[in-house]
A protein has these predicted regions:
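Helix-breaking motifs and short loop linkers at transmembrane-helix boundaries and internal kinks
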Residues: 35, 67, 88-94, 232, ...
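Conserved MFS/SLC helix-loop-helix module at the cytosolic interface between two early adjacent transmembrane helices
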Residues: 54-93
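Helix-to-loop junctions at the C-terminal end of transmembrane segments
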Residues: 56-67, 252-264, 348-349
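Paired small-residue
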Residues: 78, 82-85, 93-102, 290-298
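Helix-loop-helix hairpin linking two adjacent transmembrane segments in secondary transporters
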Residues: 94, 122-177, 222, 226
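Cytoplasmic helix-loop-helix junction between adjacent transmembrane helices
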Residues: 98-136
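Intracellular juxtamembrane helix-capping segments at the cytosolic ends
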Residues: 109-121, 305-318
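C-terminal transmembrane helical hairpin of 12-TM major facilitator-type secondary transporters
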Residues: 266-310
């Protein structure tokens, strides 16, 4: 299962995940170097996220006619150039432009990469293959971001982006060497692809993907103040908790892929139900570190166990437009990231406490579960390839 082509995709995934999140640990350094405030530097995070959302459909359309290996290499070239721009940017505006350029490669790479990963294995192993590719993203949170932050703080923030450039070059060479040629691009014209995506069976998993991400990031965005102000953990202790959550994300992602290959709908229903239960318990238990730590690890695992099942569902629901559908689903995840952060902020501004944010995440997860359960009422909305047997 862990083949060299999938490892090549995972290496690229690791680089993309590192460049997306490493900036968060370097905001004070960037702000001081470019003479902007820390909140202004923070826009480099949201600017990247919106670049993914906006760029995903544009790049998917632009690469629709390319063979998939060629498309992946073109996207890695954009990724490398964008990070070179970040490393060399003399001004805040140019750094923002380079971040957005880099983000344009993000959604399409994960989208096309997921299709390629699923095509490289037997049908009963597709979700596992996608989860292995996404393991690069989760490992970026566990290893890449802490290492990149430490490197940037020790050698200057630009050094972190030079390191990401090196990762991108290595991943690009691995794609050249190990991804097979001859993988087709689009199976039809753009009009046909958009018609396929305009049907509810293709839109439903994207709606659920967005809601799953909103649920996660309405809490994750504010996890540090929750741990410090509610649980009473020191700033140094928060770093350790985030590392443990990252391990939970990685394990949950891999386990979700394995379970989804057995029964996709049961994996999603169980994942959302477990997520709701954990978040409700976290609301009551968050004042003590003893229950909070295992609950947060479990929460991260359950949240990322949903990723590969939803990605497979989207690909199978839009067989006439797998690249575009898979890429747009990555845009849906990132739209959920931004929306979740905004929704959590709205709740806090309205008077909610950090302790109450898990309840907000549970509410959104319950809505996602309700949409998922509609497939039991109308099984036809789920592709026959992944529909449970009667």
């Amino acid at each position: 299962m862990i083949s060299r082509p999938i490892l090549a995709l995972a290496a690229a995934s690791f680089g993309i995940g590192t460049t997306e999140f490493v900036i968060m640990g370097l905001l004070p350094d960037v702000a001081g170097s470019l003479h902007v405030t820390i909140p202004q530097a923070g826009y480099l995070v949201s600017g990247y996220a919106m670049g993914v959302v906006v760029g995903a459909p544009i790049v998917a359309i632009a690469t629709a006619g390319l063979p998939r290996k060629t498309a992946l290499l073109a996207l890695m070239a954009v990724f490398i150039i964008g990070n070179l721009g970040c490393a060399l940017a003399p001004t805040y505006g140019l750094l923002m432009a380079a971040r957005i350029l880099t983000a344009f490669a993000h959604g399409a790479f994960f989208g096309i990469g997921a299709v390629v990963a699923s095509d490289l294995v037997a049908r009963e192993q597709r979700a596992q293959a996608i989860s292995l590719m996404f393991a690069g993203l989760t490992l970026a949170n566990v290893l890449g971001v802490p290492f990149g932050t430490a490197l940037g703080q020790a050698a200057g923030w630009r050094a972190a982006f030079w390191a990401v450039v090196a990762i991108g070059v290595i991943a690009g060479l691995a794609i050249i060497r190990y991804i097979p040629t001859g993988l087709p691009g689009s199976r039809g014209g753009l009009a046909r692809e958009f018609r396929a995506l305009g049907r509810w069976p293709a839109l439903l998993p994207m709606v659920i993907s967005t809601l799953a991400s909103v649920s996660m990031f309405s809490l994750f965005t504010y996890i540090t103040p929750l741990l410090e102000d509610v649980t009473g953990i020191s700033p140094r202790g928060v770093t350790g908790v985030l590392l443990m959550i990252g391990i939970g994300l990685t394990v949950g992602n891999l386990l979700g892929g394995r379970l989804a290959d057995r029964n996709l709908l049961r994996t999603l229903v169980g994942g959302f139900a477990g997520l709701i239960a954990v978040l409700v318990v976290l609301f009551f238990a968050s004042r003590s570190i003893v229950p909070t730590l295992p609950l947060l690890i479990l929460w991260g695992g359950l949240a990322f166990a949903l990723v590969s099942p939803l990605q497979i569902w989207v690909v199978d629901a839009a067989t006439d437009a797998p690249n575009l559908a898979s890429t747009l689903n990555q845009g849906a995840f990132n739209l959920g990231n931004a929306t979740g952060a905004w929704l959590g902020g709205v709740a806090l501004t309205a008077g909610a406490s950090y302790r109450q944010l898990p309840l907000l995440g549970a509410l959104v997860a319950a809505i996602a579960l309700a949409f998922t359960l509609t497939t039991l009422v109308n099984p036809r909305v789920m592709p026959v390839q992944i529909r449970p047997a009667d």
